[in-house]
Amino acid sequence: IGKYVVYWASNLYDNTDENSRKQLTYNRMVYVTTDDFVNFSDPTVWIDVDRRGGAGSGSIDVTVQKVGDTYYRIYKDENTMSLRQEKSTDLTAAIGGAGVKNYADALKCSAWSEVATNIGKGQANGYGKTFTSGEGPSLFKANDGDVNGYQYYLFADQPSYHQGPNHYVPMATEDIASGQWTVIGNKMPEANFPTNSDGGKPRHGTVLPVTRAQYQKVLEAYAPAVAVKSVDALSAETTVGVAPTL
């Protein structure tokens, strides 16, 4: 669309007086546009579905990928605590509005359409339990020639309050348009997760593609002990059973 789109979830109120707020409102997804990250458009409500009642109260945690001319987004329904997938050729098209209580009504006369609901639900999460609910998803394209044969990956946080391991549970698909996602936690053992000082593992993040040279710069700046000396191609000759000298 020629601009960056920045989006987030907000609870909206009629005025700025916090003392006048007698109860929480529901989460709505909101976006602004910018081309310089200095000046931003006025906020626009993007997803407006009142899911109050039951377990939650709105829509949060959108992640988006563009495939050809189509945008795919996955986000959390706070009522069912589940992940849903939609598609559109118009990224900033809004759905829902005042009084809209369900996604079927929200999508009527909208540029967005439903692709999948309850993504991953009921599958073994690969960490000894079942994927029941998730949040903070991160949708990203597989590298060209990915050895696993997948087209896109989806990392979703399954917190302990969703009977999960408190970190990402990976999923994958061979066709993002199908909405068919397979949980592949067995391919990403916990031992391979980075861990911070309090034992926490990755969740609610974003995966960004980088070139090998960019990755080298990141290592040099933040992990010099494991940074390689060069990313240039090289060749070496050796015999069977003897490690090459590089």
Regions found by a protein language model. Name each.
Residues 232-245:
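Short, solvent-exposed loop/linker segments at the N-terminal edge
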